Amino acid sequence: MQYFINFIRTPLPGKGPEVLAAVKASLDATGRPGNLTAPISVPNPTQNGVSFVSLIGGFQNLDEVDTMMESSFDNDEVQSRLASIDALCHRTAYILSENLSGPVERPDGFQANLISRTFFNAKMGSRNDLLATLLDVREKIDSTVKPMVSRPLAGQGGLIRVTSMAGSLQELEDNRKDALAKLASAGVLDLLTQSPWRSVGRVVHRVQV
């Protein structure tokens, strides 16, 4: 998976269950691999409501993304389905990202039940150094599944995301402590404009094709 799209939706008050059900159906209809997470720990508890994050993946290049978008915009049924979900939400955002760390290899029988997303914002001129350091630390982390390093195609130029998967909260926490120690030793904090921020979500739906 070289490229993937995240859909971040914040339901209107009382509409969470409807949004969850609608997003699950929408994911199933894409015919692409993906998942849906519900937050269990958010980076900013004062924000308006919680957000559900869905992912559509399996794009090997940007031409495949173009093809999917063109077919989506030309399909009235798809547009109606997305509009009906948006009508239940306070806010909706789409984020196209590039996977910078290669395929995510999972051992047989592994199932990701939790996903954490940590964002690092590089100082001006330090993005390449930050990326190289994160990729190096990724290889040294003692986890069942290596995290994925990615970048959004829009937004702040120095922003890099590290996505970690685990089967349990304890496993996720053990991986976090291991990663923090190795990141500190590698001098990552010296390359950042601010402290990293992190969210944790539970996988409530997955699509495998």
Regions found by a protein language model. Give the residues of each.
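Short S/T/G/P-rich N-terminal loop/turn motif that feeds into the first structured element of a domain
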Residues: M1-V209
